[in-house]
Amino acid sequence: MSKSLLWDDLEYPIQPWIRSAVDVMGFENMTPVQAATIPLFARNKDVVVDSVTGSGKTVSFVIPIFEKIVQEEANTTKMKKGHFHSLIVSPTKELAKQIHSVFESFLEHYPENLYPIRSQLLVGTNVKTVRDDVSDFMENKPQILIGTPGRILDFLKIPSVKTSMCSMVILDEADRLLDVSFLKDMENIMNILPKQRRTGLFSATITSAGDNIFKTGLRNPVKVTVNSKSQAPSSLKIDCAVVETDKKLEQVISIINNYKFKKCIAYFPTCHSVTYFYSFMQYLLKKGIIKEEIQIYSLHGKLQTSARIKTLETFTETISNAVLLTTDVAARGIDIPDVDLVLQLDPPTDPEVFLHRCGRTGRANKLGKAITFLTPGREEDYIPFMEVKNINLEEISLDIVNLPDNFYEIFKDWLLEDRARLDQAVKSYVAYIKTYSKHAASSIFRLQSFDYVGLAKFYGLIRLPKMPEITKYFKEDKENARTFGEGWLIDPPINMDKFGYLDKKKEDRRLADLKNLKSIHDKKKLKSELKKKNMSWSNNTQSKEEKVERRTKMALKRKRIEEELSKEADENSSGDDEQNRDWKQVILQNKKSKNSNNGMQGSFDDL
């Protein structure tokens, strides 16, 4: 790109306070995407921006929005009550909050003597309702709204909220907003907003949105693409390692114990997995198996909004040796400073998310490393699969260092302390398999070649759960069926009736349920025995006599038929053995003849 990256070389002079803000925030020069996008958007062009993660896309729309608001205020285009100027939509609460914080960071440098510019965050929480958001909106009169699709749609439906003065709309991580999860809400939002507006779509993987981008009301958009041989920034090194399924957790712990990093994000496949492994890793911290200076946090979509925001803030503020266990809720757009290591225990089910996960490190030209685990065999085909998408994975070899040889025994002992941990492990196991079965690259990630036993050990399970996939697996794999036929992974098996919960209320409820089930079982067994016991002697004798009588009658009938057939054969015999007929064949022919007559009778009756 031939454009100058100096702020002073922009086609128009930006506001002095904005220039001051970018200097204080450390943006010495523009990134290529900023140099291309800011002038276009400021000149009232719709834009579709496709650029690698960490390339500064957020600032590309923040500055033009501020410029337009200041310009319109200078032209005495005052914002009426209940109206707003700009709307920014993001797929997650965490990303929305981050964008809001960027706007607020710029506003810290806004002159107090000018007309006030304000922004408001619109995300669903367990504290604030939509009515609360509307009340704040009417009182504070913000020009800029940032939020998630569901909350924004509910907000815009309130009659006191007016949309006719909205002149700029941004879809950050647009490909995610335009997929099936959010498309309906986004269409409804776009229908509420005025047609005469500027629209900007921003993402590192915008091409995956396909024709859905035309549903956003774009008018003669300009596409901004920062040319690169790879989809990943040059500061990001993407590696992969072949790791046995049951060794993945040990490998993660080995890496965070021995690798020098400030912040690490470890991606797990499901919310259940994050919760489960967070508990176990806290236990390993206390045991000294994970180094004491390491701080571990958990974040996933099923946490309450307040807990998610607090966790993200704490992780962001931590200086070093911080590890965040998370799901794809933290895969897109979130810019956490000093993340220099990303671990993926499995590739994401959607290949488009792969680069977003890796892109949490190596941002703003800072060096970063991302490592993805692949299991031996078919999953190794993921490397050439990603090469087609211009993402090069370099295969590396990893060793498990300074961990106890009896790691699985430690895991098992921890699990056996509380039945609630087993429940969580089973939920995590089942959720993992369901997620794995939905992988977009289904030719690579196949349940037919899946390591069910290895996954069970990965979760520290003592017994394989009962589920259709495992039943089918054992039918096809006779060797494992013999080894794990009863599902037990430990020897000797434990008495599940005596395996209880640490929580007294849960345990009391379990014992009551167990007693009830035992009572039902005993009643059924007793009923069956009483039925046999109470059957009269005369009935038993009569039943036996009837059986003998039936057998006698059948024997006499068979003998009579044989005699008749023998007599018929003697009368019609021509001396040729081939014409002698077996009496069984005669009976069969008689039956066929009888059936044929019955069929004929039926057809006549239908006339």
UniProtKB/Swiss-Prot annotation:
Pfam families linked to this entry: CTE_SPB4 (PF13959), CTT_SPB4 (PF23681), DEAD (PF00270), Helicase_C (PF00271)
Protein family according to the UniProt entry: Belongs to the DEAD box helicase family. DDX55/SPB4 subfamily.
Originating species: Vanderwaltozyma polyspora (strain ATCC 22028 / DSM 70294 / BCRC 21397 / CBS 2163 / NBRC 10782 / NRRL Y-8283 / UCD 57-17)
PROSITE patterns named among the record's database cross-references: DEAD_ATP_HELICASE, HELICASE_ATP_BIND_1, HELICASE_CTER, Q_MOTIF
Protein name: ATP-dependent rRNA helicase SPB4
EC code: 3.6.4.13
Gene Ontology biological-process entries: assembly of large subunit precursor of preribosome; maturation of LSU-rRNA
Quaternary state and interactors: Component of pre-60S ribosomal complexes.
